[in-house]
Structure formats: structure tokens, C-alpha cells
Amino acid sequence: MSSVTLTTTTTTTSTPPKPTPKDEPQEQIYTPWRLFIYDIWVLGIVSTLAWGCRISTYLIPLFRSNVGKKHLDIGAGTGYYLNQARIPSTTQLTIVDNETHALNVALARCKHPSTQTHGIVTDILQPSPFPETYLTNNDKKFDSVSMYYLLHCLPVPVASKCKIFTHLKKYMTEDGVVHGANVLGKGVRKDNWFARIIRRGCLNHGVFHNEEDNAYEFERALRENFWEVETWVVGSVFVFRAKRPILDA
């Protein structure tokens, strides 16, 4: 039988905010119909025509070929990548998001009769986003980590986004791999008319926070934290794979 669990982690930096009227419609946002539209529109049409990166050509193969026995996926979204990547049933899968409803959707979408699936609600920007046991118990460390179309949504400076790699490597095995992709805001090709409309809308509505995001700083952060680094820019998208974390002595 499948095993699906959900954990919520807390930090000492602040107390959880009280729900506001803006937060309440989240369950309505994550309806099957809207998620289907999201997959077709954002991950299909927009990624291909606006950002110049066809997910089925570039990202799904990368995801599929870099899933280990203990895999961590950060930024659950709709669970699209996990679903399309055909993850082996023997993989122990941990999915992370800062929003419970999105996480539940991804958990349900990726459920498999013989897969252990665990969900964690946490803030990946924190220096220690996971419980202490993930540091002290080697059996809990991840040999693969994915983060696709996540970084451009985080409302922090690019330097803070880069620190995620420093935080993450503590929870990875010595031969672990991290891979992902995000839409850049600087140093990429000039947006076509469709991309200009989409980018302006995403920035104005607070969906994107990537005006200063650039390939140079992301690659530098990866090389500071991993021994083996590969990066590509596909259209307006930064794609990366980094192996063997540089662990502190």
C-alpha cells in the first residue's frame, strides 16, 4: 500500500500569520479544472511561445534522468513534472511547498501503490527548512533534488535565492544531484510581443519576482556549492544540473 504523510515545519524567526480573506480562496484555486488549465497554459503555451523552452523537449527529460531513490521536489505546483517524469515506484518521494493546498494536490497526483510519499509545508528560504533529523540521520538525506519554475516566483533578491543552494546541500548525500529551471529577467534574449505581455502581467500581479535574476549569479552560486555543474540558457530559461555537494568538514 502507498504511504502518504504531511508534515508542517516552523521556524523561530516569526509566528505564522493569521489567515486573511485573500488566503481563503486557495482551495478554489486548486480545483482540477484550473490545474488542468494551468498545465496547458503556463507549462505548455507560455513556456514554449513566451520563454522559448518547450518543457517536453528540455525539462521533462532532464527531470526524468535525475531522480534518485530518495527524491526531494521543491515547489510542488500542480505536480506536473512529477507526474510526467514517470518516477520509479521504488522512489521515496518528498514534496515541499509553502502552501498546503498546492502540496495536497501534488501528493494526490503523484500517489502510487508502492511509493512512499511525504509532504512538508515549509519555507525553503530559511537556513534550516527541514526538521533536525534530516541533518543528523543520513538515511533521511536526499540523493536528488528538483526545483522547476520556482526561483522566479520567490519575492526576494537574487542573492537570497542563491543561498537556497547553500541551505539545501546540507540535506543531500555526497553524490547527490540538484536540477531545475527558472525564467530569467536579465541577460537573455529580447522578449517577443507575447512574452512582453506575459512578463508584464506576471510582474504587475506579483507572480514573478525575477527582474534581477540572471544566469551568472545562479551559476556562480551553484559552483560555490557543488563540484560538478552544468548550466544552459534555453530561450529565457536558466536550466541547471549540479552534482556532488561541497560539504563542510
Curated annotation (Swiss-Prot):
Biased amino acid composition, Low complexity: 1-15
Reactions that this protein is recorded to catalyse: 2-acetyl-3,4a,8,10,11,12a-hexahydroxy-1,4,4a,5,12,12a-hexahydrotetracene-1,12-dione + S-adenosyl-L-methionine = TAN-1612 + S-adenosyl-L-homocysteine + H(+)
Annotated segments matching region Disordered: 1-26
Pfam family, any one: Methyltransf_31
Family stated for the protein in its record: Belongs to the methyltransferase superfamily.
Function according to Swiss-Prot or TrEMBL: O-methyltransferase; part of the gene cluster that mediates the biosynthesis of the linear tetracyclic TAN-1612 neuropeptide Y receptor antagonist. The decaketide backbone of TAN-1612 is synthesized by the non-reducing polyketide synthase adaA via condensation of one acetyl-CoA starter unit with 9 malonyl-CoA units. The FAD-dependent monooxygenase adaC then performs hydroxylation at C2 while the polaketide chain is still attached to the NRPKS adaA.
Record's protein name: O-methyltransferase adaD
Lineage: Eukaryota, Fungi, Dikarya, Ascomycota, Pezizomycotina
Encoding gene, per UniProt annotation: adaD
